[in-house]
Amino acid sequence: MGAMAYPLLLCLLLAQLGLGAVGASRDPQGRPDSPRERTPKGKPHAQQPGRASASDSSAPWSRSTDGTILAQKLAEEVPMDVASYLYTGDSHQLKRANCSGRYELAGLPGKWPALASAHPSLHRALDTLTHATNFLNVMLQSNKSREQNLQDDLDWYQALVWSLLEGEPSISRAAITFSTDSLSAPAPQVFLQATREESRILLQDLSSSAPHLANATLETEWFHGLRRKWRPHLHRRGPNQGPRGLGHSWRRKDGLGGDKSHFKWSPPYLECENGSYKPGWLVTLSSAIYGLQPNLVPEFRGVMKVDINLQKVDIDQCSSDGWFSGTHKCHLNNSECMPIKGLGFVLGAYECICKAGFYHPGVLPVNNFRRRGPDQHISGSTKDVSEEAYVCLPCREGCPFCADDSPCFVQEDKYLRLAIISFQALCMLLDFVSMLVVYHFRKAKSIRASGLILLETILFGSLLLYFPVVILYFEPSTFRCILLRWARLLGFATVYGTVTLKLHRVLKVFLSRTAQRIPYMTGGRVMRMLAVILLVVFWFLIGWTSSVCQNLEKQISLIGQGKTSDHLIFNMCLIDRWDYMTAVAEFLFLLWGVYLCYAVRTVPSAFHEPRYMAVAVHNELIISAIFHTIRFVLASRLQSDWMLMLYFAHTHLTVTVTIGLLLIPKFSHSSNNPRDDIATEAYEDELDMGRSGSYLNSSINSAWSEHSLDPEDIRDELKKLYAQLEIYKRKKMITNNPHLQKKRCSKKGLGRSIMRRITEIPETVSRQCSKEDKEGADHGTAKGTALIRKNPPESSGNTGKSKEETLKNRVFSLKKSHSTYDHVRDQTEESSSLPTESQEEETTENSTLESLSGKKLTQKLKEDSEAESTESVPLVCKSASAHNLSSEKKTGHPRTSMLQKSLSVIASAKEKTLGLAGKTQTAGVEERTKSQKPLPKDKETNRNHSNSDNTETKDPAPQNSNPAEEPRKPQKSGIMKQQRVNPTTANSDLNPGTTQMKDNFDIGEVCPWEVYDLTPGPVPSESKVQKHVSIVASEMEKNPTFSLKEKSHHKPKAAEVCQQSNQKRIDKAEVCLWESQGQSILEDEKLLISKTPVLPERAKEENGGQPRAANVCAGQSEELPPKAVASKTENENLNQIGHQEKKTSSSEENVRGSYNSSNNFQQPLTSRAEVCPWEFETPAQPNAGRSVALPASSALSANKIAGPRKEEIWDSFKV
């Protein structure tokens, strides 16, 4: 029966142990532990291993005190081989040590009992022992008979011990001691042991050797410790619980001995076997076995123990519980301890990881300290095995992580940045000073040509473009990154927006191919267009700033970190898609500027500003493209110093160059003269164009300002324009004067044939006459007078030839419209002229006052000036204000090109000259006396004709320039090259001696039909008949003493001339009736001119004046009105002349005797007027719409002098 019960009991026991182990493994999750299990002895031991943190430290540089004690004990008490094995786990070191018994690590710091619940690898062994102990206690307490039959139940106990090793692989040995006696027995009666040897379990019955357990040693402490510790404190409430109650208690593990606090843990130890330590650290876990006395009081019966192998159990020195807990040497303020798993039962299995901002000063490139592994050997003294104290050093400022003492952030070059910001501040200061300088010289022509407001706007925008360098000098922040975009975009829009709009204005004004007038783009209009551009930029910047603020609310920062190739960190403003959009917008805007530069490439300018602006735009386009490419591609790798230098170079290569291109030429040209050809210079600012009432946008202006056109095309266009103007002039003339419609005569063919015969005179005659004029001008005063008296026919013959040559040139000249040319020159320009020119300009003032009193100039003045005015057609027809400004400060030699003037200036000039004429008439003899002295120069009268005055007055005085010198003077080679007039031919009628004689005759008496051409209507008023022409200077102002000397010779001749004119007055009135309309004007003019002194050199041409006048009159046949109207007008003029002649008879009688030699030439002229009266007719034209084109040659003076002389010649005929 017993043999059959043994296997059955063994199966039940194994089943119970297996269920107990499984339940133990599930118990921590299935149900909570009892209060005694959670807090045994009032100390918590159920904590999981964790990291030591800085909060555990009590001092800033604190480290574990237990670690220091452990290190001291290991160095002092533990043998070196044992300590080396404890640190490395190397068994070779341990085998060399000798021993006589086992070695325990007793007295070392750490909470030893707590390891059972703390270390997870020991939980299974503890649970197995607990279930086995509880099972045995239940069996002994439920059946008292088991205690009496120990020998019979040995198989049960051996099966129980074997099941412990079989159920838990970490248990290397299990033993059980049992005694029927209580504490009185010194040694147990039964001692059974099971040992694991490699892959098999060895059962041993050591009952015979049990008495040695009676001695209390380290090996028997597991037995004596529990026996001494036993105290009967467990009592049952009821004696008769029965098997049901015991089973319930067993399931709840609250039976006798079921509490884990009744287990005993031994220190880790090494077994000594055969005089040497056996490798592998062991720990003994023992538990007491209890039985019941007859009074149901628990009684100690034995001990069950297991030896657990710790070689695979890790030591957690970072934990607060367990063996060697808290014995790490990490400084908790700058590092933290991290255990290393899987190394086994060795010390130093942890890492001291440096916290953020600290680094380990070791040679390893990691921020931790790792203890020596188990494969490393330790040699030397005991100090080598002691754990070292490691300190993590702080990183450089601003580094969150570092591996050594090297800086992690880019180190800025302070001296370089200081030099850059200093130079930038200097440039900004110079820019501000430039604004003040430009405002100071705001009245200068170079500044006004560009516009003061526009230049100041460009300089202010440049100041904004200088700010990005200043912003990048400081550490990046959100505000500075936003300000960087604002300064860049606003500055770019201001500077290059203004430059582009200036180019746009040049394109609209100077290259307009339409004849319609468009509003001129003034500086105010350009500023309004710039305001629109800036408004768009403002709207974009406000939207971008709003998006940035919204991103900041979403924790999206505008500041980022870049890393260089050396792994150095630097802060930077992040580049987003908005930056790409702004770069593309700048590029497109500059492309528009490049197009405008190409469009205005042919436009001339006073200071070449469009050319410099084109260079600035192209420079900005190229440099900005390179800058944005580098910025977008290499921004994350360019440190702050490189980025600062990149912005610095971009700023000065674009902004500084732009300022230099716009300002340096203006101030460099201020000391030098601009180009001489001011007519081709195009000014871009207003230049008082609004007040002058003229805008430079007509078809002629646009055609002449574009050099790409063919001159032949321009000539054809001008011819068409002149024809249209002529048709419009005649239409307006007929509308205002209906009676002129009947004056068109069909006999114009006769006049044309006569003109054709006159123009067949060869040109050699005019050249010969010009040479004789030059020779005659070089003689002295007395000799010149003698030659005049001896050879009057020869000089008159030469004069006739030269007059015919002049008419020939005039016929073949281009028929021009009556456009008004500017003839005034600035005072400063006169000062730079030749000495003779300045003297002639002074005399021109006096001559102008005398001629204005007559209210008319001769038709000869218009015809002769037309012949050469074609050479002075400017390439750009500018307004009067523009001409005045362009020649205001010019000091170079005068140009021969004439400048057109608007009607508003002509009207103002008429009013001024009429007022001067009135003063001249009332002044009388006193005014003529003052005319011999230098008069103050009029800025509006002598501005543009100093050169012409010099040419025309060369005949009266020897010191003046000769006719041969005139071709060497610079002349404007205009587009009308075929109509150029020979200067010698044009001046051939002004030989020495002839000019003085012409001044003493009234042109109304010699050629009254020429005077009628200047008369607009039947009753011309002073406001209509006054022409806006400049008059040549007289010889009186140059040689006053000489002219007074010749007065006595002039007066008798003038008197004879007046006598002859009285005889022919009635006949002339019958033939030329139309001259009576303007007779009042001729009388006043004759009164002043007849009293003008005559120079001796001019006496040579007395006899030649009448035929030449006749020839000139023959050339006017194309514009003669019908004969009937001419006769009526002539009678009226003759009546008025007769009335006026009574008042001036005294002066005429003095002059009459000196011109007797010219009476032979009077009769042919009178006969011609009687036979061909239609040739002396001319249509009346309103002077308000006409003006005389005055070239810069000698034709101006010739026409001016010829008028009064012809009038006195006619008086001499009548006398």
Swiss-Prot record:
Q: What is the effect of changing residue 135 to A?
A: Does not affect ability to regulate cAMP levels
Where are the residues of the annotated region Disordered? 23-66, 757-999, 1117-1164
For bias kind Low complexity, which ranges apply?
Answer: 52-64
Write out the ranges of the annotated region (Cache-like region): 85-281
What residue intervals hold the motif VCPWE motif 2?
A: 1071-1075
The residue numbers the entry assigns to motif VCPWE motif 1 are: 1006-1010
Effect after changing residue 505 to E: Does not affect G protein alpha subunit activation
Protein name from the UniProt record? Metabotropic glycine receptor
Q: What is the lineage of its organism?
A: Eukaryota, Metazoa, Chordata, Craniata, Vertebrata
